[in-house]
């Protein structure tokens, strides 16, 4: 009986540990509510399958890299969904776990949805403000999560890519009206990753100061291949380091490759990992590779 009791206790502890792993911490970007959304911040989000909508309290979900592999780099993941919903799993958590594999700690953003029925938000003024606040928030809390505030990137899918372009490649409309210590930090990311980005924000208006970019899209994507190509040409023309991958016979929403049978699509996250490594974002400033991460030559 005693052995059975011990076994039951161990099973319970394992179950608790699994539950903790399945529920990463979530933090509101504005403790008192996002500007203009204070009255609706307590409304519950709507979750249908793996899609999230009715977001009035913007937040970050923290998905930490394993301590043996973490190298101090951080990326804010911005899911798409046409500004009506968020493709939370395939363009959020799956992307975060993929980044974890190369030692990057991820922060998945829930932002206000301008095209959600009943919403009064705008993409340029509210959703983009949520991403800017997220960049500042991660910098303010960098020490808590063991990340380098100078190796912070943003990664956006489709509509999320529009927010990335608005924030990284276009001038900030000025400091927020309601300032706190977080708002005083820079909202400019150190690098940007655009995955079949939407057309809003392209052509960009401030590419001379834009951060280095990795851009990926499908050649059959009538919506988002043209802005991907156009932004790449604009960045390179302004002397900004940029890398573009356009995949043949590929349309929109191939996510992290898991929705395609084409090997080139399946392996595009490896090309992103190569770019992150080649650009130096995965190397701590002390020059020492983290334990458990092989060098590119291995």
Regions found by a protein language model. Name each.
Residues 1-7:
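Bacterial N-terminal signal peptides that target proteins for export
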Residues 14-17:
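N-terminal signal peptide c-region/cleavage motif recognized by signal peptidases
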Residues 79-84, 158, 219-221:
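Active-site glycine-rich loops that stabilize anionic/oxyanionic intermediates
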Residues 238-298:
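C-terminal catalytic histidine-bearing segment of alpha/beta-hydrolase fold enzymes
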Residues 215-217:
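Short beta-strand/loop motif that positions the catalytic acidic residue
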Residues 26-27, 33-52, 56-59, 64-71, ...:
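Serine-hydrolase catalytic machinery in alpha/beta-hydrolase-like enzymes
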Residues 222-228:
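Conserved alpha/beta-hydrolase "acid-adjacent" motif
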Residues 129-210, 289-297:
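Primarily recognizes the serine-hydrolase "nucleophile elbow" in alpha/beta-hydrolase
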């Amino acid at each position: 009986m005693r052995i059975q009791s011990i076994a039951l206790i161990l099973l319970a502890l394992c179950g608790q540990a699994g539950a903790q792993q399945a529920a990463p911490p979530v933090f509101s970007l504005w403790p008192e509510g996002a500007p203009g959304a204070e009255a609706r911040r307590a409304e519950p989000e709507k979750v249908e399958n793996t899609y999230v909508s009715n977001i009035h309290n913007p937040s970050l979900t923290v998905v930490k890299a394993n301590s043996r592999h973490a190298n101090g780099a951080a990326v804010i993941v911005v899911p798409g969904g046409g500004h009506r919903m968020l493709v939370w799993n395939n363009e959020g958590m799956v992307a975060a776990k993929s980044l974890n594999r190369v030692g990057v700690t991820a922060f998945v953003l829930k932002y206000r949805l301008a095209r959600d029925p009943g919403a009064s938000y705008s993409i340029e003024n509210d959703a983009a403000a949520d991403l800017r606040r997220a960049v500042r928030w991660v910098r303010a809390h960098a020490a808590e999560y063991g990340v380098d505030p100078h190796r912070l990137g943003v990664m956006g899918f489709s509509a999320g890519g529009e927010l990335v372009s608005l924030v990284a490649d276009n001038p900030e409309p000025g400091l927020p009206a309601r300032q706190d210590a977080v708002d005083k930090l820079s909202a400019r990311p150190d690098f940007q990753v655009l995955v079949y980005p939407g057309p809003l924000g392209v052509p960009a208006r401030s590419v001379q100061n834009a951060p280095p970019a990795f851009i990926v899209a499908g050649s059959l994507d009538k919506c988002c291949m043209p802005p991907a190509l156009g932004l790449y040409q604009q960045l390179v023309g302004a002397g900004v380091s940029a890398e573009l991958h356009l995949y043949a016979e590929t349309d929109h929403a191939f996510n992290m490759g898991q929705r395609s049978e084409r090997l080139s699509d399946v392996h595009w996250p490896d090309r992103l990992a190569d770019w992150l490594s080649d650009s130096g974002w995965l190397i701590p400033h002390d020059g020492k590779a983290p334990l458990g991460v092989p060098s590119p030559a291995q």
